[in-house]
């Protein structure tokens, strides 16, 4: 897990001129290798696999009629 640590005393600076206002300090992440999760160790997809999805099941009883009507009619302007 990453730890959030301040840069150091030299990076600390007062905020504004008021005496009651606290100090603002910057933080940095230590060990950012695992910051984005374990998915970074996966290999990239091959070129033929990009854009392909798994099987999709369409559960609509009217899908045959809709697809049939789309192929029967030519879109306007063609």
Curated annotation (Swiss-Prot):
GO cellular component: a single term: dendrite
Keywords: Cell projection, Protein kinase inhibitor, Synapse
Intracellular or extracellular location(s): Synapse; Cell projection, Dendrite; Postsynaptic density
Gene Ontology molecular function: any one: protein kinase binding
Region CAMK2 inhibitory domain: start-end pairs: 41-68
A single BP term in Gene Ontology: positive regulation of inflammatory response
Tree of life domain: Eukaryota
Assembly and binders: Interacts with CAMK2B; the presence of Ca(2+)/calmodulin increases the interaction but is not essential. Interacts with CAMK2A; this interaction requires CAMK2A activation by Ca(2+).
Role description: Potent and specific inhibitor of CaM-kinase II (CAMK2). Plays a role in the maintenance of long-term retrieval-induced memory in response to contextual fear. Modulates blood pressure and vascular reactivity via regulation of CAMK2 activity in addition to regulation of left ventricular mass. Mediates the NLRP3 inflammasome in cardiomyocytes via acting as an inhibitor of the MAPK14/p38 and MAPK8/JNK pathways, thereby regulating ventricular remodeling and cardiac rhythm post-myocardial infarction.
Family indicated by similarity: Belongs to the CAMK2N family.
Protein name according to UniProt: Calcium/calmodulin-dependent protein kinase II inhibitor 1
Organism: Bos taurus
Source species taxonomy: Eukaryota, Metazoa, Chordata, Craniata, Vertebrata
């Amino acid at each position: 897990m990453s730890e959030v640590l301040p840069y150091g005393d030299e990076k600390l600076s007062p905020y504004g001129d008021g005496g009651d206002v606290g100090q603002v300090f910057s933080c940095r992440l230590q060990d950012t290798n695992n910051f984005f999760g374990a998915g970074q160790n996966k290999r990239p997809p091959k070129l033929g696999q990009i854009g392909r999805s798994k099987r999709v099941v369409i559960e609509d009883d009217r899908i045959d009629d809709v697809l049939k009507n789309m192929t029967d009619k030519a879109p306007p302007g063609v």
